[in-house]
Amino acid sequence: MNRFQEPEARRIIAELDLPPASRGLDVGCGVGLYALWLAEAVGPAGRVTALEPEVSRVDAARSLTAGQPGADRVEFRVGDGTVLPVPDQSVDWLWCGDVLHHIVDTERALREFARVVKPGGRIVIKESQVLSALFLPGHPELERRIQIAEIRRTLEEGAGRSFQERRQTTLPALRAAGLASSVMRHYLLERRAPLRPADRDYIQHTVFSRNWGERIRDLLTVTEWRERSSLCEPGSPDNVLLDPDYFCLYPISVFIAAKLA
């Protein structure tokens, strides 16, 4: 997802206007690209600690980012979003990109976020698809059915609350954790044919093959699955990504909460 969103993600980070030489925390850093871009934003005297819950993921992020600009200012560590391995009031800001909706105990995580941020610091929650994206232009009914199936599938991982619901309740979650939400920003990512390799790869492999793959097949009718396969399978002559007029629209929301001094 990082490369797919890179132009907009860099813009989002730039518009945060993070203080030069500040210290920040990236909770759920994934492959580490956001951590690199955050490190670039705070300059050569800034520092970013990037957390992932598993050693293998930390090692992968460290390996992927090695030698890239800003990598020497990023420390990758093992850490859980609900039990941060960071002292109280030790960072100037905290970034959590497309991760909070995965944490079942949201309030506990947000209270941990508030614990480690200095008074007056900011907690930035980035969530993709608070509003559903458009990946199948011209097929609104089928795409809605697929989206509903995807929502239902995430109920299990979300302990009875879908990822979509969790994303859409970020504001009340911040309030419940005692944080003042002062800013909410929305960005619309647009991609058109001919697609960049990173865009094509994300849409085909992450969206069509993984998110809309076998995991939701039993939640669609036979007809719906056949239509989905015709439009989404990589070997299909009707794959929408082959259309010279193909486009997708993908919304990103950013919630910025201030920790009161």
Where are these regions (language model features)?
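Conserved catalytic/acceptor-binding region of the Class I
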Residues: 124-197
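Conserved Class I S-adenosyl-L-methionine
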Residues: 168, 182-261
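Class I SAM-dependent methyltransferase SAM/SAH-binding core
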Residues: 25, 31-83
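A short glycine-rich, Lys/Arg-flanked "PGG" loop and its adjoining helix->strand segment in the class I
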Residues: 107-122
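A short SAM/SAH-binding and catalytic strip from SAM-dependent methyltransferases
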Residues: 92-107
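A short acidic, Gly/Pro-enriched loop at the edge of an enzyme's catalytic core
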Residues: 82-93
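Conserved alpha-helix/loop element of class I SAM-dependent methyltransferases that forms part
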Residues: 3-20, 37
